[in-house]
């Protein structure tokens, strides 16, 4: 207690000594309460501003450090990406894709944008755009180019004839060499006996088919045959 009193008395003597007192400037009096409030307010505002600047600077440094540690593709949040970034990525993806897939995606997008009743089929699109036909032919095998288009453009009757001829050739290839139809009489193995046997087999097969048919249909077929023979 005595030590505290001694310290207080020493401080008072130092402050009250005439040599150490500061003389006030001329023209300055005691500050009013308004001036004191304004000074305190300015000091508080400055302290708040400096604190916010320090916090922003610290957050910026932290984000830069975090971006450096992350993968280049994950540095930006997906929801904050701009439209330009999406366009650049789409262009880069299209460059990496095969040209045929690019065109297929464009065609599918075009068909989806159209009204269901106005959607064009692939055949009409290819017939209207010759460039699409040439590009499709380039992508296909040389032996298979334009087969689908030619098949669709042909008359249904001719199409059936071609299909029947193809089925007949496939059937002849699958049959035993001794059972194939003799197209040329000079070929070895196609003698008169084999020809007669084939004719008998055909007659027996036709009779068996007639027996399996309905009697009314059988008579109708016979009438048609007689009419054709009379003509």
Curated annotation (Swiss-Prot):
Post-translational modification Proline amide, affected residues: 72, 78, 99, 116, 142, 156, 177, 215
Subcellular location field: Secreted
Molecular functions per Gene Ontology: thyrotropin-releasing hormone activity
GO BP terms, alphabetized: eating behavior; histamine metabolic process; hormone-mediated signaling pathway; negative regulation of glutamate secretion; positive regulation of gamma-aminobutyric acid secretion; positive regulation of insulin secretion
Signal peptide coordinates: 1-22
UniProt keyword Secreted, yes or no: yes
Pfam families found in the cross-reference section: TRH
Bias type Basic and acidic residues, positions: 54-70
Acidic residues bias spans: 222-231
Region described as Disordered: 50-139, 206-231
Residue numbers bearing the Pyrrolidone carboxylic acid modification: 70, 76, 97, 114, 140, 154, 175, 213
One term under GO cellular component: extracellular region
Keywords: Amidation, Cleavage on pair of basic residues, Hormone, Pyrrolidone carboxylic acid, Repeat, Secreted, Signal
Similarity remark: Belongs to the TRH family.
Primary role: Functions as a regulator of the biosynthesis of TSH in the anterior pituitary gland and as a neurotransmitter/ neuromodulator in the central and peripheral nervous systems.
Family matches, as PANTHER family: PRO-THYROTROPIN-RELEASING HORMONE
Protein's name in the database: Pro-thyrotropin-releasing hormone
Organism of provenance: Carassius auratus
């Amino acid at each position: 207690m005595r030590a505290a009193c001694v310290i207080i008395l020493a401080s008072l003597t130092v402050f009250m000594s005439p040599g150490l007192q500061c003389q006030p400037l001329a023209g300055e009096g005691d500050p009013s309460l308004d001036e004191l409030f304004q000074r305190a307010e300015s000091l508080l505002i400055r302290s708040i501003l400096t604190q916010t600047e320090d916090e922003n600077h610290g957050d910026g440094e932290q984000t830069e450090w975090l971006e450096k540690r992350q993968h280049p593709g994950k540095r930006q949040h997906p929801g904050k990406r701009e439209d330009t970034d999406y366009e650049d990525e789409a262009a880069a993806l299209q460059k990496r894709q095969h040209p045929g897939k690019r065109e297929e995606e464009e065609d599918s997008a075009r068909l989806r944008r159209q009204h269901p009743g106005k959607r064009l089929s692939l055949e009409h699109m290819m017939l209207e755009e010759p460039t699409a036909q040439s590009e499709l032919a380039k992508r296909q095998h040389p032996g298979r180019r334009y087969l689908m288009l030619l098949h669709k453009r042909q008359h249904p009757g001719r199409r059936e004839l071609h299909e029947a001829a193809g089925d007949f050739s496939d059937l002849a290839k699958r049959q035993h060499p001794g059972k194939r139809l003799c197209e040329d009489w000079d070929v070895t193995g196609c003698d008169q006996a084999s020809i007669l046997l084939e004719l008998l087999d055909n007659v027996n097969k036709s009779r068996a088919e007639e027996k399996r048919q309905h009697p009314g249909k059988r008579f109708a077929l016979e009438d048609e045959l007689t009419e054709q023979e009379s003509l």
